Amino acid sequence: MPLTLEAQELRHCYGDTVALDGVSLAIAAGSAVALVGESGSGKTTLLRAFNRMIVCKSGRVLVGGAPVDAIAPELLRRRIGYVPQQGGLLPHWTVRQNVALVPRLTGAGDGAAAVNDALVLVSLEPSRFGARYPYELSGGQRQRVALARALASNQEAVLLDEPFGALDAISRTEAHEAFERVRSARGFTTLLVTHDLAEAARLADHVVVMRDGRIEQAGTIGALRESPATPYVAELFARAAAAHTALARA
C-alpha cells in the first residue's frame, strides 16, 4: 500500500546556512511530487528528511501517519526506497548482488525472486544482466539497476534525488520509460528532486518550487505555468520555455 508523506514546519541548518525554513508539505498516498528549484534551495534536504538520512533541527516528519523517528530503521528501508544521483552502486558487486542488498538489509533474506522481479520490471533481463558489474553497463542501465534495488523489497514510497540528471538524452529517455512502467505497475508514492521542469512534467503529478529553504509555490505544472505566484516561479517557466524554443529552432 502506498505511503503518505508529510513534513510539518521543518527547519534545518548547515552551520549558518539555512537549508529548510519552516517547510510544510503533505504528499498523498500513490501520488508523484517533484521538487524543483536552484541548487541550495533545500530540495535534497527535504527529500532526505523522509528516510532519516537527515534529522532536522525542528519540525515533524510523518510516514504513513507515524512519526518517522518512531519507525525502526530496517522497517523504514523496507517501506521507502532511495535512488541517489549517481546510483550508488557498489562497483565490485554484480548487478544481482547490488539489487539484493536492500532485501538483506531489511531482513528479507537474499530475495532471489524479488531481485529477478525488480530487474524484469526495469527491463533488464536477469539472465543477461545479473552477473554483470556496474562498469559493464551504460549510464541508463546503471540507473535502472539503482531503481530496481530501491524496489526490491516492494517499497511503498520511493525517493529519487536527481537520478537522471547526468544521463545523455537517450539513456535518460530509457530511464524515464522504465520508471513510468515501474510506477504504473507498483503504484508507490514518489518524491523526485530535479532541475528539469520537462522531467517534472513527465514523471510527476504535482510540482513544488523551492527557493532559499522555503516553498515558493506548489500545484500542477499547468497551474504553475498559467498562474505563477511569484516572479521567481514565472522566471523558471520562462527559462524552460526558452530552452525548448531554442531546441526546436536548432
Positions of PLM-derived features:
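Conserved ABC ATPase signature
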Residues: 133-137, 141
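Conserved ABC ATPase "signature" C-loop
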Residues: 59, 212-213
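ABC ATPase "signature
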Residues: 218-219, 227
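ABC ATPase NBD coupling module
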Residues: 67-81, 105, 224-228
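Helix-to-loop junction immediately C-terminal to a conserved catalytic motif
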Residues: 51
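ABC-type ATPase nucleotide-binding domains, specifically the catalytic core motifs of the NBD
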Residues: 15, 71-73, 93, 97-112, ...
